[in-house]
Amino acid sequence: MSSASIIRNSSLAPSGADKITWVWNNMPLLRAVREDFEKERPLAGLKVALSVHLEAKTACLCKTLAAGGAEVYATGSNPLSTQDDIAAELDRLGVHVYATHGCTQEEYDLYIRSVIEPEPDIIVDDGGDIVHMIRTQFPGLEKKIIGGCEETTTGIARLRKMEKNGELHFPMIAVNDADCKHLFDNRYGTGQSVFDGINRTTNLIVAGKKVVVAGYGWCGKGVSMRAKGLGARVIVTEVDPVKALEAHMDGFTVMSMEKAAEQGDLFITVTGNCRVITEEHFLRMKDGAVLCNAGHFDVEVDTACLNRIAVEQKQ
């Protein structure tokens, strides 16, 4: 157990262990990597800091890095995706964990800071928060860092902006650009998991509904494909004319969000951009329309405006 960890409850570890074991048995490639790592110890003496969605699959990544000799410091990249039982089990295994489900922004910043303060050699980022904090609060560490990788489209956009402004001072690999990431994880993984979440949350049938998908990148393609497979009538909104044409040729109805707002029953944003659905769209929507965001950050739907104009709020 890591004495430095900040977790919700260590007694949750057995539940986390069961989840990790199940996932591990379905990850043959990572198991093979771990076997090599245990023999070769390529990360011996190095510190690795991770900011990822802290759940069973990323826990297996943490275990693999540790098997390679790394001292691993892990936190969540989104407070709502952190699983407390996974954090507890990783802590039991000796990973330094700083993560609690539903933490405040202040706690989230503390957790990011906690994986940076040990001065990591390698970074595994999902959304760019580690790199951003190093740049703004720990600039002296930049020369020490060997490099790292960024998983998601949103984080890569932040990194490219930093690079353009001359603010990125160590190499970062854009994992999302790899074919094995966007062709499969984004399209099939995100496509399925979005509807897993929607179905568990709403308990609504998708068939026959008009589903509006904002964005036709790889995630948007996957979401649209799964919506169609579930029997929905799919409308795609896309600002890139080439991607919009691709959606049309794939058999989907394409229109602006202004028009789609009047028709949709279920709205799913997967753009990585800010304020995709705003007040002008809320006012056009049907009563009972369901809004969902599948982007990394909670910025695609203008929830501040929605809270302001809402007649009633329930949780």
What are the residue ranges of the model-derived segments?
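A short, aliphatic-rich alpha-helical micro-motif
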Residues: 116-117, 206, 260-264, 282-286
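A short helix->loop->beta-strand "cap" motif at the edges of active sites that frequently abuts
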Residues: 69-70, 95, 141-144, 231-232, ...
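Glycine/serine-rich phosphate-binding loop and adjoining beta1-alpha1 elements at the start
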Residues: 2-43, 74-209
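Glycine-rich phosphate/diphosphate-binding loop of Rossmann-like nucleotide-binding domains
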Residues: 52-70, 185, 189-263, 269-274
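Gly/Ser/Thr-rich loops at beta-strand to alpha-helix junctions
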Residues: 50-58, 78-82, 128-130, 218-219
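ADP-ribose/adenylate-binding Rossmann-like module
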Residues: 76, 122-126, 138-154, 283-315
